Amino acid sequence: MDSDGVSHAPSVAQSAPSWNPALRHEKDHAPAATAKLPSQVKPESSSEEESEEEEEEEDDDEDDEEEEDSDEDDDEEENAPAATAVSGPTPIAVLDGAQDSEDESESPSELTKSTPIVQASQGSMEKRVEVIGAEEEALVNAAQALNISGNPATGQTKAESTDEAESDEDSEEEESSDEEAAAAGEHQADNYEHQGEATALEEAVNESVRVPLVDDAAPESDDWGDSGDPFEIGGLQQDPSLQTPHAEAAGTTVGDDVIGNTTVGGNAGDDLDWGNTEEEDFFGVVANKPVESVEPAQPTQSPGAHVVQAQDAAPAKSEWDLDLDLDEDFLPDNEDGPVIELSDDEGFLDDEPTAPVEQPASTGIGGASRYAPQAAQTSHSVASPYAAPGQFANPPQGSMTRSITTPAGGVYNGYGQNVAYQQQQAARPTMPTSAQSYADKSKGGYASPYDLPDDVVTTRKRTTPRPVISATQPAIPPPRTSSMSSSSAPPRPLPPSNASVASLSPPPSGHSMQGQMTGFPPAVPPKSAPPAKAPSSDFFAELPVTSKPKPPGRYTPQPAAAAQSPSLQGPPQFTQKERTASWSSLRNEVLPDTVGAQPHLRQPEQLPMFPSQPSVPTRQNSLPIPQSTAPPPSSRYSPAPPSVPANNARYSPAPPTAQGGANSRYSPAPPGSQGAAHARYVSEPPTGPARTPSQTYAPRTSSPLAFHSTPHHQENTTNVSEQQLPGHHVTQSADGVPRAPFRSPLEGVSEALELDSTSSDRPPTTARSDTPPPTRSSTSSAIGSPRKKGNYTPQYQPMNPMAPSRSLSQSPATGMKQPGPMYGAAPIAASYGTHIQEATTTNSIPHRRQASLNYECIVPEDERAVDPLQRYKGHPVFAWGLGGTIVTTFPKQIPRYGGGMTAPMVKCSPGEIKIQSVKEIIPLAEDLAKFPGPLKAKSKKKDVLSWLTKRLESLELQIKDPNTEHTLSVDELKRLEEKTLLLKLLQFLVENDGRLEGEAANAAFKNLFSPEADNASDAEGSFSTAADIVGRSRSNTVNTPAEPIDARAIEDLQKMLARGEREKAVWHAVDQRLWGHAMLLSSTLSKDIWKQVVQEFVRNEVKKVGRSNQALAVLYEVFAGNHEDCIDELVPASARAGFQMVSTDGAGAALNAQQGLDKWRETIALILNNRSEGDVSALLSLGKLLSQYGRVEAAHICFILGRSVAHVSGVDDALADLVLIGIDHKQHPTELGVDLEPILLTEVYEFALSLSAQVNSHIMPHLQNYKLAHAYQLAEHGYRTEAQAYCDAIAAAMKATTRTSPYYNLSFIASLDDLSKRLSQSPKDSSSSWISKPSMDRVSTSLMSKFNSFIAGEDDGPSSNAATGTEVGPFAKITGDSPGLTPSHSNADLYADCFCKFKICSFKYIRTKDVIRATEIALRAAGQTFYGVERQPPPQPQLSPPSQRTQAKMQSYSPLRAEHNVSQPSYGNPYMPTPPNEETASASSFGGYQPQQGTGHSFDDPAPPTSSFDEPSYQPYNPDADDMEEDNKPKKKSIMDDDDDDLVARAAALKIGSGSNSKSDADKKADEAFRKAAEADAKRDKENAAKKAGGGWLSGWFKKDPNAAPGPIKAKLGEESSFYYDPDLGKWVNKKGGSSEPERATATPPPPKGPPMGARSASGGMPPPSGPPPSGAGLMKPPTSAPLRSSSMPPPMGLPGSRSSTPGLPSDNEGGPKPPTLARPSFGAASGPPSRPGTGMSNASSIDDLLGAPQARKGAGAKKKKGGRYVDVFPQGQAS
């Protein structure tokens, strides 16, 4: 169209199917698809036709087109005085001759610039005008048809406002068009560039065989929604009727470089006027056509840039549609992909700054001229998600309104390039004056005025029917667009008209809110932006040259997509005036309005598939664009929701950004995308289409799908959150894709932030209801009773470091609802969503991760190259070491440079291996590490007090710290103070030995709970300053004057009493407020009446006097005995139920129900200082109340004070009031044991109670489990010694009580035993080696002594044996002290060899069956029982079953420990109690398993006893084998053996000899005489041997050899003369022995290897009563039950206290048959057993004997003779 208003579109008739969606839509919707363009249309006729078209359009889409037409008509009238004002959208019609004459001057230049296609001479302007008029009519018809299909509502906006805006814009556009025309006239040829190949745009404009304009009949009405593409969906319903770009927008200089005034379609005629007049924009005219009804068609209207073509075609809508048949491919492409907003840039629409954008009235998108800026809409205009906001028209308004010039491609030009983006990128010249020739703009590629509409059309095509959206009430985007995250979001109102002078010019990129690139006049005055738009010399210069493929699909990124990306996302919503030309420079950061308009339709941002094609250039502007209003976060994908509040979107369809993610067909923007959407374009300048790749590697985030993982809720966060995240805050990939805010890999995810994203809408939890938080198990209710959820004042914030670690424990909202971190304190912000929001709202550039220097690794040439784990690249290694050590190693990366390499390559090699202590790497808190636990004895009292004092000091310092008030909430401060009180109470409890009674206790209570009591009287006396009365509640005394006493009331009372109605008299006194009478009378009645009277008194006389008397009221209730209900005086039941407390007396505002809670200290002080019966129950009730409100520390103080009624138990006990001090087990049951401090405080409480215990220490069974957890943590942090001490303390506690506890279950015992084993086998804290380093000074002393005690034992002689019997034994000492000496069970080994042939493995592996078999074999092999009675096979099998049971028990725990550790039961759980108390010491180490081996072997050869000790892990005692040989060879007896045997034989002879007369008295005397001599010799030898043995185990061994030689000789001598076989005894007896040395039997050095072991196993297990006397007789009996027990029960547990009753473990007693089994029936006479075995048995019965016995045995064993003598006695006796 010329500036005169004449439109020249000769090529329009020839153009291929119109690329204009509006036209195409007309085709689709037009009833007649074959409408033909009238060959000639006179201006008059055009006006008439326009009027007709207006009428038709009014019928179809009156609202939309009326608005547009009215706007354009106004513009045309203003721009073309000669032209008849078209009342309807007819402005496209042929202009009058006057207009022609006026515009011709400008048109030539413009036509040459913009449309080379139009080649008619300027002289024939009139002819062109006629043709153009016809085309315009056709366009008008098409537009009308489009408007018919469009939503009529779009034109609802009043035409007056649009007309005003259009008039202003027209005036401006005319000026610009005149200038452009002049410029074009001067250098038309220069500006024109011939393109060898016709572009899609040209084909769309020019008729071609492939896409004939007229031949191809389009459906009468295009169903843009049929495709299902966002393009179709886009804004058809939502978009208000597109207001035809008025002359305001005419001459759009799209970036002045991009499209400028270029006539799309290739019309080159200079006479073509592109919007200089009111009709500048075809769409303006078309859109205004519905306004025809408002204004008569004016054929003379100056056509807008688009209108130029439409004017000629106006005669027939259908024909025009056919003539302008949109390229079928082109339109579908637009549908497929978001239309690139090739909106006429400033150049196109702005060419004619016909009227400055001043039409605020046109705020309504529909009614107002599209170009008329609408103030309300500027900030709020919601971009239609379905249509890209056109610069020339509001995309929401109807796609049909698109100017003819807009290609169907919409924002994308025929080359698939995003014109809108280009336009934005190019700084727009001032809209009013810029009128560059289209030729200039086509240097990058020829672009005609049609090209510009092409950009615009794309969006409109989809949005054909667009509802009119008033700025105030943006239309809700149609839900159908998947791209729109929130269909419900109100459309953004058009930007205010005042935005720029060129109101009609398409909004510059600066007006991101408007769809500037759509080609439609933005609702906002586009001209202001044009100046900002840097003129680009070539329209296509910025776009990468590509084949002009139409966008394959709305989603297919176009080369211009990158450019479009800014358009996709509008800059932060600004009023148009806010947007300045300067913003155009930020076009990369600003999204064109198309974003809002076409979120649904717009083609996804052209993100390069590879970094080589980054869609977004690196941000050039570091500063984020100010976000006066959040820009619609048009995501790079059409569906991206507008980042700005949807309601601000210029186009109604714009979805709210928050929801956009969810609804958008594209993956949701990154979490920060709320702001990211705009952020990407605003803060992150999108790269130009030609952006060169900046990265060689394309991050996965560049993929649109990379953001699917982003939760939609983040986008759904409030608009605040969107605004909070300015685009510049969001990091972007090379492609410009917004990334989630960078987080360090080690950075912990802030729960508060995540909660905020989901719950930013949620009101801050700080609002507290008076209802206490519900217990964790209870469901929350609206009422918020203590069990119901509600925000309540005592919200517990774990932020308080001193508070229990559990976070949110007291927060009613967070603690109950939010899954806040259960362990560890959560940041306060986590509790309160508002804090999070505030943090996010702040404009702060987040840390941008620096480019990491990750170089490629040199790939090895061997098989390592195919390693799927790529270990050759090196990886850090971390491992936990022994004894709390950490082993780490990090690979070394050595850079290697090569020729031609820009960056070095790295070769990894193993790094240094570091061994560090956990204490250094992960140190345990000092206060926890220095805790003096375990607290076993009273000696720890001082240490405990010291620890509590330090803890209190740290708390007090924290309270005094001025920062504490700022970092902690009021509730947290209260809890911190209460925690201090709790520690003080515990400190006093320890100091006072656990007693809370007495004067000291009363004084302490006064100091703790009423420190101000002493000063209270002084303070009450007078108030020197106003500050003194602060905090004092107002007294209501004035309102409750004392009532006078009524004499008649007294008389009535007397009468009632006279009648005997005492109760009635009481209530009468109450009614008359005769409280004294009432209480006196009620005291004589039942307790219930007394309570009720007191309640009434408190309610009427105490509480009403003042609001601070709750504590006194509670005390009175306590006196009355209302222990349960007294707490109602602090917090009424109604308040606990969640009801608001209102002042009934009207004296003040509503009461704070929790105000009474703060009176708990006063209440406790009153109760404790005025003790009454049952007041502890009141303390318990108060504690429960405080616990309900999360005041854990205060509640536990009450429980401690009322400990007599408080129930302390485990968390599984529903009735438990206290589990661990300092933590609420009801609301946070799973947190118990996680934080050590509550465990330590509870240990202190237990210790304090134990101080007051008269008998045993006070033990809390449930606490032992937590102690074990404490031990584990200590072990984990490298405190092995302390952990081991805890294990021992727990074991002792279990054995200390005879009462069984469910907490001592199998799982607990197994865990304890497992930890104990680990600790015993791990190195000590001082050394990391397996064996602790011995100090040099002890090498000669300590080491040798240990060897002596460990290997040999120092018991050569009977005296030494006796001594050893009382000692604990080497095993207990060595095993406990030196974990490195694992073979502590070597004792057993020393004697096990005798039976080792049967015992293949340690008892752990030998099951009872094996033992039985072995014993039986041994018995058979022996063919005789050594020591006769003692070893009988029968007992063995009998014992085996019980042993199996016991063994099974023991095995499960720690079978091995017995081996090395005598002190600890190795097999039986060391902690399992063993019933026999006597032998616990002895059995503890070996007894656990002795039953198995002992039971089987104890009666067999001496070997079984050895086996009872399990196979010797340290050193099997070979002498056992020798002993076996000795058994076979009785001759090998030493004198000592003979002596021992003699002693035993003499004892037996004394018992039996009296009855036996086998020999004569003379013989006896001779034998005795001879025997005495022999004994004397033997005694001397024995003494010498003992002396030698005393030297050490080595000496014992050496001594053994010398003894061996004389031994046999002496034994033979003695045997020959004195020994005889006694059939009664069944053994050989020494006649001479008599009772000569009976005492030596008791002092027998070592118990016999075989029998002693058996005896030991048997006797060790059996209780002392069952134990046999030193003589062997007793041995037979003991085996019954004793051995079984010893074997089954771990020795330490052997004590009855820890007896087998431990849960889960069958007691040894279970095997009832065991005693009979153990009983040795074969022994016959109890006295019969040989004396030596008897003594051995007796010695073995105790732990000391076991320990000592092995030592003695060791010595004896070292001497084989000793071992042999025991064995030899029998064979020799038998032989003899």
Curated annotation (Swiss-Prot):
Residues 46-79, 162-181, 217-226, 321-353 have a biased composition (Acidic residues). It comes from the Eukaryota. Residues 557-573, 761-782, 1652-1661 have a biased composition (Low complexity). Residues 1-129, 143-277, 292-817, 1428-1776 are annotated as: Disordered. One of its GO terms (biological process) is Golgi organization. One of its GO terms (cellular component) is endoplasmic reticulum membrane. Keywords: Autophagy, Endoplasmic reticulum, ER-Golgi transport, Membrane, Protein transport, Transport. Residues 187-196, 1560-1586 have a biased composition (Basic and acidic residues). Pfam families: Sec16, TPR_Sec16. Involved in the initiation of assembly of the COPII coat required for the formation of transport vesicles from the endoplasmic reticulum (ER) and the selection of cargo molecules. Also involved in autophagy. InterPro entries: Sec16_CCD (IPR024340), Sec16_Sec23-bd (IPR024298). Belongs to the SEC16 family. It is found in: Endoplasmic reticulum membrane. Residues 522-533, 629-644, 1662-1671 have a biased composition (Pro residues). This is COPII coat assembly protein SEC16. The lineage of its organism: Eukaryota, Fungi, Dikarya, Ascomycota, Pezizomycotina. It comes from Phaeosphaeria nodorum (strain SN15 / ATCC MYA-4574 / FGSC 10173). Residues 111-124, 144-158, 394-406, 415-439, 612-627, 692-704, 716-734, 1445-1454, 1477-1496 have a biased composition (Polar residues). The keyword tRNA processing does not apply. It is a peripheral membrane protein.
